[in-house]
Regions:
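Long, low-complexity serine/threonine/glycine- and acidic-rich segments characteristic of extracellular
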Residues: 1-50, 64-67, 71, 85-171
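An acidic-aromatic loop/edge-strand motif
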Residues: 53
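Boundary/junction segments of secreted and surface-exposed precursor proteins
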Residues: 59-63
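Short, solvent-exposed loop/turn segments enriched in Ser/Thr/Gly
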Residues: 80-82
Length: 188
């Protein structure tokens, strides 16, 4: 949220994964600009119940998955230290709470399902918009060759979206030259 004269407001939809019993809640927040950062919280809030304005949402988040930036193409080249770069959108918001079993934002590198990469803390909502944001997560020390990456993101209504990409780590000119793409096409 934008801060003006030390004040801010923010709207969001509470995930379905809450305890619906009325009771005390807590809102934690973090703020930063170019010269200062800080955090705080309030416990002056009662949480519970549900809204009469329930939406019929059965569609998961839309995810655009890249390596390093949005110029990446499926099967493209990276170095051994690329970043997961994902753009995420959902009309009702992204669930980043991490409080419900199996509803974390997660990535699977090279089909290693026993060691998912948890990305909840790496999701950053677009300023003043809870409906979309991006994930940037640094990877390091990847071996030369072909790699796969899948990502799963949940919205606040417990719908999931998935995306998948493949990439090649190439620190060797011979490997890199064997993986040529005509992109963008046509060349200008």
């Amino acid at each position: 949220a934008s801060v003006t004269n030390g004040e801010f407001s923010y709207e969001f939809i509470v995930p379905k994964d809450i305890n619906y019993t009325y009771g005390p809640g807590r809102i934690s927040y973090y703020f930063a600009n170019d010269s200062v950062d800080g955090s705080g919280f309030t416990e002056k809030i009662i949480v519970g119940g549900s809204s009469d304005e329930v939406t019929n949402d059965e569609t998961g988040p839309l995810i655009e998955l890249y390596m390093n930036d949005s110029n990446f193409i499926f099967g493209g080249l990276t170095d051994e230290n690329p970043s997961i770069y994902a753009l995420v959108n959902d009309d009702n918001g992204i669930n980043t709470s991490g409080t419900s079993l199996g509803h974390d934002i997660s990535a699977i590198l090279d089909k290693n399902y026993t060691n998912p990469i948890l990305l909840n803390d790496y999701y950053v909502a677009t300023l003043n918009n809870y409906k979309n944001g991006k994930i940037i997560y640094p990877l390091s020390g990847l071996s030369d060759g072909n790699h796969t990456l899948s990502i799963k993101v949940w919205d606040v209504n417990n719908n999931s979206g998935k995306a998948y990409t493949e990439f090649v780590v190439a620190n060797d000119a011979k490997l890199a030259i064997s993986h040529v793409y005509n992109y963008p096409n046509p060349f200008t």
